[in-house]
């Protein structure tokens, strides 16, 4: 929950390139052996995904890291676990330092310009919206991980007005404005780790 709420006026206009599939990339310049090896190092040798799962983005887990505390890990492999996340809030002590790590797989095709939009609500009123560019990712067997903030820690708000229960919704979209996943979660900001305020 940083203070850069919805500020995009200083961001230059970004125009995404035309979408090119993994198969199209592999077929371009197929006769060039050096380029073929380079592409395989970037894209892998095959598409890693179950044939019965059409999703391009599969979030595996969301990890809340709080400085000096054990991590809180939410597995998000299934729709049931994603729905359950909203009913299991995590606690932030006011002024604590935290960061959030997402672990995910990309399957079937390249996801270009993956973005995360996190909107936080308190008592139904929007408090903040933050957008993070995560990057472009090719399908691979190993999971990708992205941590926000990438450097340092985020500081939780403090003071009597900041304390309370919050809900949030994080939406993952790409350059083609395809919505890959929407997850709702809840958290509380308290004066100490065990208080009921």
From Swiss-Prot:
Domain of life of the source: Eukaryota
Record keywords: Cell cycle, Cell division, Cytoplasm, GTPase activation
Gene Ontology molecular-function annotations: GTPase activator activity; Rho GDP-dissociation inhibitor activity; small GTPase binding
Pfam families per the UniProt record, alphabetical: Rho_GDI
Gene Ontology biological process terms, A to Z: actin cytoskeleton organization; cell morphogenesis; mitotic cytokinesis; pinocytosis; regulation of Rho protein signal transduction; response to bacterium; Rho protein signal transduction
Inducing stimuli: Down-regulated in the absence of cap.
GO CC annotation terms, alphabetical: cytoplasm; membrane; pathogen-containing vacuole
Assembly description: Interacts with rac1A, rac1B, rac1C, racB, raCC and RacE.
PANTHER family noted in UniProt: LD16419P, RHO GDP-DISSOCIATION INHIBITOR
Family: Belongs to the Rho GDI family.
Protein name (record): Putative rho GDP-dissociation inhibitor 1
Natural source organism: Dictyostelium discoideum
Gene name of this polypeptide: rdiA
């Amino acid at each position: 929950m940083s203070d850069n709420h919805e500020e995009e006026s200083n961001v230059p206009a970004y125009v995404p390139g035309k979408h090119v599939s993994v198969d199209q990339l592999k077929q371009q310049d197929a006769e060039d052996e050096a380029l073929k090896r380079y592409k395989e190092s970037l894209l892998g040798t095959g598409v890693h995904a179950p044939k019965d799962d059409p999703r391009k983005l599969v979030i595996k887990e969301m990890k809340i890291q709080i400085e000096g505390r054990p991590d809180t890990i939410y597995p998000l492999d299934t729709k049931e676990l994603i729905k359950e996340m909203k009913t299991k809030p995590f606690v932030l002590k006011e002024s604590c330092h935290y960061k959030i790590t997402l672990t995910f797989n990309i399957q079937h095709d390249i996801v270009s310009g993956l973005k995360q939009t996190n909107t936080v609500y308190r008592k139904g009123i929007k408090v903040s919206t933050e957008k993070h560019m995560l990057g472009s990712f090719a399908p691979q067997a190993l999971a990708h991980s992205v941590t926000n903030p990438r450097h340092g820690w985020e500081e939780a708000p403090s003071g009597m007005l900041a304390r309370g229960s919050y809900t949030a919704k994080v939406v993952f979209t790409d350059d083609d404005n395809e919505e890959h996943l929407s997850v709702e979660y809840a958290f509380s900001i308290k004066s100490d780790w065990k208080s009921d305020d």
